[in-house]
Amino acid sequence: MKLKTFLIVGCLGGLFTLSSCTAPTNVKDYSAYVNPFIGTGGHGHTFPGAVVPHGMIQPSPDTRIDGWDACSGYYYADSTINGFSHTHVSGTGCCDYGDVLLMPTVGKQQYRTTDPQSQRLAYASSFSHKNEIAEPGYYSVFLDTYQVKAEISSTKRGAIHRYTFPENTESGFIIDLDYSLQRQTNSEMEIEVISDTEICGHKKTTYWAFDQYINFYAKSLE
């Protein structure tokens, strides 16, 4: 297997460190009772991605693009994933966001579907809920089309992606700035290649929120 890890930061200037500590004994873990899939069906309009409370970035899978049940980008009855975008609303009656879509792929892919009304992008992957995990701060799914395991976590201002690809395959990623939920208006899109392992970019969107500017930086930790 081949591992590739990405760090995507929504706002530069933050710093975080890791340190060791001793956990208190006899503390009940209430997070074990949390089910992030609650509200992802019916008209709940929630998403299962890994999010820090009040975090500025919300990495989560998108299974559809348009319609009332696409407000959060994820609908439990769906069986395909278009990719993992980094801005979402939860539990709202109006849709927005779905910015900076990242999708791992194997082999050469078509960029766009020929049907502009399709809920599925040309490079989408099928998946099964039996191979999907959502916990507080962690999301994982197996992408059947590419045989890739995707794992996502987040910090207050960044997202951490880890992908496990099949051995001896032509693996890669699609970063789609023109994608957005409800096909909102995207403009001023740009990606800059900083190095072999770093990119940055920006875009401007208009839908529920007018003149929204998105800036991002991504680095491969492979």
Q: Language model features by range: what are they?
A:
Residues I8-F16:
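Hydrophobic helical h-region of N-terminal Sec-dependent signal peptides
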Residues P24-E222:
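Accessory carbohydrate-recognition regions in carbohydrate-active enzymes
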